[in-house]
Amino acid sequence: MSEKNSKDVILIGAGVLSTTFGTLLKELAPDWNIKLFERLDKPAIESSNERHNAGTGHAALCELNYTVEQKDGSIDVEKAKEINEQFEISKQFWSHLVKSKQIQNPQAFIRPLPHISFVQGDKNVNFLKRRFEALSPLSMFKGIEYTEDHEKLKVWMPLMMEGRDPNETVAASKIDEGTDVNFGELTRKMAKNLSEHDNAELFYRHEVQDFSRRKDGKWEVKIKDLKTKKVEHHITDYLFIGAGGAAIPLLQKTGIPESKHLGGFPITGEFLVCNNPEVVAKHEVKAYGKEPEGTPPMTVPH
């Protein structure tokens, strides 16, 4: 094995995590050498693909699980503030990439879209109203609106109100400054930008199989070229595992203490696509509901 294969950083997976981290390294440490390995034949095919996630610009504008009701009935907004700040930083980073001409055509991956929280029943309506009152004074949630009026709700979200019982107890809050994000397109743009970096190489159809830690602290990574069936060994100072569902098994192969006592569980979901323009035109919002009591947050209808 030759030391000529030695690189500073190896990124595993070509989804939004690895391409984002690689892009950050390109900006902050342009002299570092980067190798990205992806098992499939192009970036953003699995979890980052636009058909495999909700495409929400997560800023805690409509996601109710970030504002938790306390035992005394108050609403804790600290997590919502944290999430909102993090998403603002993401938008600033993407803006920098556009302004520096590293990625083009931003409207292909992000666009403005009102975010709505919608609830049903007296208990949930009471919660949403208190959430609205807790968020309203905060500048990051400026412009949030609240209503229980069916006629106003028909203006906000006509498709969701169509055929609904006019006596049903419902409520919604709305913020117009929400966003819809095509994480698949964003990932593809960052992968292309990274591939044009002098010190970066992207390898598709390459499967990372194992790791071993050398005495000098570096990592030896066993990688199989799925096209040629050849097994390669690469030496690197740092590893970044952004491999979606394969991340935990790969992390466990490193043997590091942080890999212990971790687990995952499968989540199944279904995204329905409407190709009827007349129906689509009635729903120009991102709407999130509230999960049924006693169920995990990923059961939120949206």
Regions flagged by a language model, labelled:
Residues 7-35:
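N-terminal Rossmann-like FAD-binding beta1-loop-alpha1 element of flavoenzymes
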Residues 17, 42, 246:
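Conserved Rossmann-like nucleotide-cofactor binding loop
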Residues 26-50:
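Glycine-rich FAD pyrophosphate-binding loop
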Residues 55-155:
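Dinucleotide-binding Rossmann-like beta1-alpha1 core, especially the glycine-rich loop
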Residues 59-61, 257-286:
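Central beta-strand plus flanking loop segment that forms part of the substrate or channel wall
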Residues 241-256:
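Flavin (primarily FAD) binding-site architecture
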Residues 281-302:
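FAD cofactor-binding and catalytic pocket of flavoenzymes
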